[in-house]
Every structure is written in structure tokens, then in C-alpha cells.
Amino acid sequence: MFFHSVQQGETLSSIAADYRISLSHLIQANPTINPNQLFVGQSIVIPGLPNPNTIPYEIHVSLSQHQLTLLHNGSVVKIYPIAVGKMLTQTPTGNFVIVNKAPNPGGPFGTMWMSLSKLHYGIHGTNDPSSIGKSVSHGCIRMHNKDVEELAATVPIGTRVRIEP
């Protein structure tokens, strides 16, 4: 079972949107929670996601180094170059999980999109390989297409993603 810890300003609606599930599904999974009285630190069950402790993979992102590191049971498997958000549209920092995958999303997203548990943010490919290594995105983590395809084939939905400055 996967739990989300409520952050300042979040509502059940915003949490449902972040995890791409319906509000009714979220309420059904949390029958003892009053949707109008959430508090910071409260644990909310997110239906449909596995317990993250059962997933041996983890992704660490360093915005300043423009690197995404894939770990397996705490050991580095591979380090990928990435592009991140520019000054006005910075990549959010914090702890997230991969909530879905969409091959061939089209346009600037390259050949793969993996949604993070923050609405409108994800890890994706690119139609502009020269952007990798720079701070040029609208906040997403951009990778070479071959790299994001390899990553998506390796990590399951529910994989933890830690993004640091």
C-alpha cells in the first residue's frame, strides 16, 4: 500500500490530481478521512500504487549537476545527463513517485513520458537533443530518447524519485 503525506495547502482534490486518480476513488480508499479537514502530515492511502518498499529502484535527480541517477537497492546503476527547468519555470524539488507511463506522447516530449506525482511534471524524452545538460525546460526532467526509453523499461510505476537542487 502507498501512502501520501499531506503537505501545506493540499486538498484531496489536488492530491487526486497529482496522482492521476479520481477524487471519488481517493475518498473511497480513505473512508475514515474527512475531506474537509486534512492536516499537514496526515497519511492518505493512494490506491493503485504499490508499496514503494517493494520496489528496488530509486531515482535521484540533481538539478545543479543536470544528472539523473538510477539506483538499485541503494547502489548506482547508471547516471544520465538531463535538462531541467529554466529560472522562470523551475523543476520542483522534493520526493515524488512515477504514477504512469505513456510511450510516444508526441511533440516536444520525445518517445516516452513518465508522470510524476505532481500534476504537469514528468520525466520525458525530447525532440531537441541539444538541450540536454541545460536549464531550458518548463520544469520537467528531459532526457535523450534512448535514455528515457531505457529508464522506463527498467523502473516500475511507483518508483521513488527524489529531486534535489
Curated annotation (Swiss-Prot):
Any one cellular-component term (Gene Ontology): extracellular region
Subunit structure: Monomer.
Endpoints of the signal sequence: none
Species per Swiss-Prot/TrEMBL record: Shouchella clausii (strain KSM-K16) (Alkalihalobacillus clausii)
Protein name, UniProt field: Putative L,D-transpeptidase YkuD
Active site: 124 (proton donor/acceptor), 140 (nucleophile)
Domain remark from Swiss-Prot or TrEMBL: LysM domains are thought to be involved in peptidoglycan binding.
PANTHER family assigned: L,D-TRANSPEPTIDASE, L,D-TRANSPEPTIDASE ERFK_SRFK-RELATED
GO BP, sorted A to Z: cell wall organization; peptidoglycan-protein cross-linking; regulation of cell shape; sporulation resulting in formation of a cellular spore
Principal cellular location given in the protein's record: other
Pathway(s) it belongs to: Cell wall biogenesis; peptidoglycan biosynthesis
Domain of life: Bacteria
